Amino acid sequence: MTINNIIIILVVLAIVFFYIKKDYEKSVCILGISYVCLPVIKIGNGIAINSSYLLTFVCVIMMLHLIFSKKIRIDKTIIEYFAAMNIGLVVMVIALLVNGNPKWGDIIHFVGMEQYIVAVYSVAIFLKSYKLDKKLVYKKIIVGIIVLNYFIGMVQLFAWNLGEKITRQLYIYGGKDAPINTVSNEVGRFVRIFGTFYSPTVLGVMSLMMLTYITYELMNDEEKFVQNAILYISSLGLGLLAFSKLTIIGVFLIWMLEFIVLLMKRKFQIIPKHFRTLGMTIFTFLLIGTLQYMIGLGPYVDYYYFKASNLNVAMKSRYENLIEDNHMENLEENNQGRTERKENSQKVTGNLQDTFQIFKEHPIIGVGPGQVKNEFVGDSEYITLLHNGGGICFAIYAVFYGGLIISYYLKEKYQELFLLMTIGMGGISMMVFSYSCIIPFLSFCICREKTEKSN
């Protein structure tokens, strides 16, 4: 039995133990941390699966107990989430059968999507049914995530051989080894920490979500200012140590969006605190940047902080010439003698253009998950959603999440509002609804009712 499976078994036993002891807060806290940080399940012969499948199975068992004990509490938003996501899933199934290239292996795609939906639904149900103080629960979850990621991140940064061995053993499996292979072959050390993930990009998304959550606490809980400030700086520090472009750009975009909302809502008394958060952000950049220079990462600081994190440059790699037809024959016929322009256009094409072209050919319901013409599927939740489910599926998601955002804005639920917007921002550069680390935070967002701390 591998160390991965031993860790997973012990964690699952802890979740079940505290659940049986009716210490639901600890059970849900461990569950939330596990969705983010738990290693992959190693089966043998190089085969591994995401441990979120096992965690979701445990959630289903706990849900059944809730149902049979008649303690389950469900509100409208949770039902709407479950219904909307499953309707979208049905659309993708139809799209695959009608327009796609169906294979037996595609069942895995749909099982993964459904377990994600069930996991988000289950965690939200636990928060409501046991009347947990969700803000206290999530602060504890964030502390656990930060501690584990700094521990592993520091090993990666300062002990390459051990860090690589731990990362490959715990978090790398088939199809997910490209980032660490690139580091191994081209650099020979970790210049970007991976934390408890297979890629620093995922750590960057997690960093941005955590600091967005803590921002609200900084502005509304003066009694715990020092504690919240430490959590904010620590959360941002993880994204910077990962040289995450999403974190570097996103932290300022989120700050601007929050500032605009505060002005629109005339929350003038909070604005000084919001500028205080900006000062903490700049301080963290200076602190982490200085430390990175001191350990010989100066060239990477210059590149990621000032060049690669240019918003226009960051978007071009994915979205350049997205809406233009990628059949260059037409351009050549209409512009005889302009071969150079044709070649240059090909060079600056984003990696999602072919994916978007498939959507344009099947705009109503898409083609389902998987490739039909060797197009790249990934790196954007929005384009992937259009590819997989077409305009219908995109509309379902837009109506649900858009309605939720508007509702939170009107009801001044800023923590949920900006956490949803941060998840949406992450969707610009990755498929956020396929990563288990998003599950606990999305569950927080669909818990609309005010909850009280359980006894």
Label the predicted regions.
Residues 38-47, 303, 315-392:
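Long extracytoplasmic/lumenal interhelical loops at the membrane interface
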Residues 210, 254-256, 417-455:
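Transmembrane alpha-helices of multi-pass inner-membrane enzymes
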Residues 14-17, 60-71, 96-159:
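Transmembrane alpha-helical segments and their membrane-water interfaces
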Residues 28-43, 55-118, 422-425:
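N-terminal hydrophobic segments of proteins, predominantly signal-anchor/transmembrane helices
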Residues 273-274, 281, 407-413, 443-455:
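A juxtamembrane structural motif centered on a specific transmembrane helix
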Residues 151, 157-161, 262-333, 357-358:
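A membrane-periplasm/extracellular boundary helix in multi-pass inner-membrane enzymes
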Residues 218-228, 252-264, 388-424:
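Hydrophobic transmembrane alpha-helices and their immediate junctions
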Residues 139-167, 188-189, 195-243, 247-264:
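Alpha-helical transmembrane segments of multi-pass inner-membrane proteins
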